[in-house]
């Protein structure tokens, strides 16, 4: 190809990746906030506002003490300005009645916001097969299908509500998978979390609906610190979906969440995420700092936890969904697509810790880097000396778009049992002139050609997503890449 055609090609492909962020609007609403700053008084005030039992306040204060003794981790392949934790609002909520009895009492502006995001909470329009918990800044504003789920014993509510109604379950499981001192950001979350979702699936129950939580950050100065806790009892199954967006601001906002999953004997938890926080502008200004701890405990024999994620947003992503395979014949899975563009930075991956006998794990990671972005996969497979017959398969593939993006892979494998079997493979490829020229020769436009290549590259992960998310994820990747191949 000539230099002129190369220029045209690069210009066309660059147009393909940069599409305006359509969720960047904000909602003007009357708010109840705790002034910015972080100390014991703020933590006590959060607990008081939520009328929490004594054990939870003690949990928070213990976590805060631990956090003050810790340092922000600096080993990841990401660079960002130092976060001023005293310049963050830790509680921001729409002003509402203390107890909402129906959606009629929810501020119409909030309902309109979620409608614009494609999340309908009203009875006439809500999805028939998905129960949704909608979280706006620091609080849950509505949960659908609670009564229908309760009929088969399934508890699905905001974690704030669960603390009031099922304190014994919260006290038993909160912090049981991610201890308060696990890492810097989980300790912060344990001290200041304000809401999130709680799911409890009783013994011998298959949850009849997909459970879903949609997180929306709205306030420019606030962070979001939600907590999700899912417990699946013996012989139960549940599928949980998670989505998120945020307004388009020039400044950065902090999102530090914790997710804990507990699967008992023969239980199956499938956890899917489409992460679409605001990523910042084309020059790397603004966007969400996304520091998340996700971990599942396969406590019972034959239990299974599967993580599937599509990461397209955030200025910075630091996230490693993991499985502790304690029960014999337990199984852990991780399927991921991480897309970075412009000046985004992602350091993400998974940990599979094998403890029980004949445990199995599978990791499939797909990284796509465009623009000036940096995309890093970081994985740990640990086989303990008790994990007789453990098996792991890991696959890490990177796709580079353009000449300025960066992809790294850091696998770490530790084996203490000679009966274990580990397989690891990795590849790096690039969308270049030859591939594009191949499509053009056959009358296929650049946009369609790139879309087909990316869709094929990610197919192994997309097939693991629930039907409701799979088509949306494919479409989202295409939109995110509008304008960036070059």
From Swiss-Prot:
Q: Which organism is it from?
A: Trieres chinensis (Marine centric diatom)
One matching Pfam family is SufBD_N
Major localisation: plastid
Q: Which NCBIfam families match?
A: PRK11814.1, sufB
Q: Which controlled-vocabulary keywords does the entry list?
A: Chloroplast, Plastid
Record's GO cellular component, any one? chloroplast
Q: Which cellular compartments is it found in?
A: Plastid, Chloroplast
Protein name listed in UniProt:
Iron-sulfur cluster assembly SufBD family protein ycf24
Q: Which PANTHER family match?
A: FES CLUSTER ASSEMBLY PROTEIN SUF (PTHR30508), UPF0051 PROTEIN ABCI8, CHLOROPLASTIC-RELATED (PTHR30508:SF1)
**Which intervals of the chain form a coiled coil?**
none
Sequence similarity: Belongs to the iron-sulfur cluster assembly SufBD family.
Query: Could you mention a single GO BP entry for this protein?
Result: iron-sulfur cluster assembly
